[in-house]
A protein has these predicted regions:
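Dinucleotide-binding Rossmann-like beta1-alpha1 core, especially the glycine-rich loop
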Residues: 32-112, 121, 236-237
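Glycine-rich FAD pyrophosphate-binding loop
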Residues: 7-29
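C-terminal catalytic lobe of FAD-dependent flavoproteins
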Residues: 97, 140, 230, 234, ...
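Helical element adjacent to the flavin cofactor pocket in flavoenzyme catalytic cores
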Residues: 124-181, 189
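Gly/Ala-rich phosphate-binding loop of Rossmann-like dinucleotide-binding domains
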Residues: 3, 7, 144
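Short beta-strand to alpha-helix junction loop
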Residues: 41-51, 76-85, 124-146, 153, ...
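Flavin-dependent oxidoreductases
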Residues: 161-167, 171-250, 254-263, 274, ...
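Short loop/edge segments at beta-strand edges and connector loops
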Residues: 17, 70, 104-106, 154-156, ...
Length: 401
């Protein structure tokens, strides 16, 4: 997101990516939720970026052609004793600027979601919550940045920094790179890079979240994203539809030491199934087609760290970007790009490319249009993946960009 919004300005920009492609870390292993913004502490940078990112997402989805749906969310309250917590969540959301929030009673809740537990007494309804495809969002941002001149260097791990004469030398496993400014967006490793240069140290704990993904025949089990009342470790285990028609269940919240620890555990999966089953009834967990785990970059103060690092001029942090990081990413990208504009005196490009064409999905076409597409491009008639009906044409489109 930072690269995409920075690409609006003149200048040479390079993304150093440790993995073989974009969207290989936390960006690919998360809940795929666009949060409304009622949970983050009022007055925090996290709350500000959450709301702004939520408001930006619909237009961004149109501009960059990725899947997004404003399906709304429900935070379910399971006891009368917890109603004050639900009310506090509502009031926090109102202070944060979230529109259309409403506390609904059990009758209205079960009209909205028949599969929610019969023991539920109320819920916080946020119609502005949504779901998104995190893979295509990330890829779309990267492709649009590339179209606007941003360079990418993959399989390149940063190992250190040297500051001299107003420039940073970035040391990597593929040689050195020199830049006036460094933007640190290294996820669970952001504190490691920050602590190499800053006098004020950060500490990030990898927080593992296990998930189950259910088959598409469960896609109408719930229509809203169903949350539990949030606790110290996050927003609890959710049950949500996905933009692809599946149901996703998760995550757990387990603090670990391993920054690459994305293995699932039987204990973690059993825990999330039990917790999800307390919120919804008859969860079709036997329809699970895969399980996975992702890591959240939990900063000790549970706050986004965005700005110039203390004692390290021209080194800009984007650290501690845990949930609602996906939702906040467009706002963070815009915020950092404007910060860089002011610091460097950047000029806007005369011909910025604001849109991007997504990979065509033939399943969205009418029968007649699909037949016409096959006549024009026969590769779209060759099914490579029969389960998901992925065609050769889609694969060729994706790899020839």
């Amino acid at each position: 997101a930072v690269a995409r919004y920075l690409s609006r300005y003149e200048g040479r920009m390079l993304v150093l990516e440790k993995a073989e492609d974009v969207c290989c870390g936390t960006s690919k292993a998360n809940s795929a939720i666009v949060h409304a913004g009622f949970d983050a502490a009022h007055g925090s940078l996290m709350a500000k970026m959450n709301l702004e990112g939520n408001l930006m997402m619909p237009q961004l989805a149109k501009d960059l052609d990725f899947a997004f749906k404003m399906n709304g969310s429900l935070v379910v309250c399971m006891s009368e004793e917890d109603l004050p917590k639900l009310r506090a969540l509502y009031e926090n959301g109102v202070k944060n600027g979230v529109k259309e929030l409403e506390i609904v009673d059990a009758k209205r809740l079960h009209e909205l979601e028949p599969n929610v537990s019969k023991h539920a007494v109320a819920a916080l309804w946020a119609p502005t919550g949504g779901i998104v495809c995190p893979f295509n969002l990330t890829i779309a941002l990267a492709e649009n940045a590339f179209d606007n001149g941003v360079e990418f260097q993959f399989n390149t791990e940063v190992t250190g920094f040297t500051w001299e004469d107003g420039f940073w030398t970035i040391h990597t496993n593929h040689g050195d790179f020199e830049s006036r400014y460094v933007i640190n967006a290294a996820g669970v490793y952001a504190d490691v890079l920050h602590n190499m240069v800053s006098t004020r140290k950060l500490h990030i704990t990898p927080r593992r979240g296990d998930y189950c993904l259910l088959d598409k025949n469960t896609g109408d089990f719930v229509s809203h994203t169903i949350f539990q009342l949030p606790g110290k470790l996050g927003k609890g285990v959710l049950v949500s539809p996905t933009v692809h028609g599946n149901t996703i269940v998760g995550p757990t919240a387990i603090d670990i030491d391993d920054r690459e620890g994305t293995n699932t555990t039987a204990e973690g999966l059993n825990d999330l199934i039990e917790k999800a089953g307390a919120t919804v009834e008859h969860l079709p967990i036997r329809q699970t087609i895969t399980s996975f785990a992702g890591l959240r970059a939990h900063e000790d103060h549970h706050e986004f760290v965005i700005g110039e690092a203390e004692g390290a001029q021209q080194f800009i942090d984007c650290a501690g970007i845990e949930s609602p990081g996906l939702t906040s990413s467009p706002a963070i990208g815009l915020h950092v790009s404007e910060l860089m504009r002011d610091l460097m005196g950047l000029r806007e490009k005369a011909h910025f490319i604001a849109t991007r064409r997504g990979v065509l999905d033939p399943k969205t076409l009418s029968k007649e249009d699909y037949q016409q597409l096959i006549r024009e491009k026969p590769a779209y008639g060759q099914i490579i993946c029969r389960c998901e009906q992925v065609t050769e044409g889609e694969i060729l489109d994706a790899i020839r960009r």
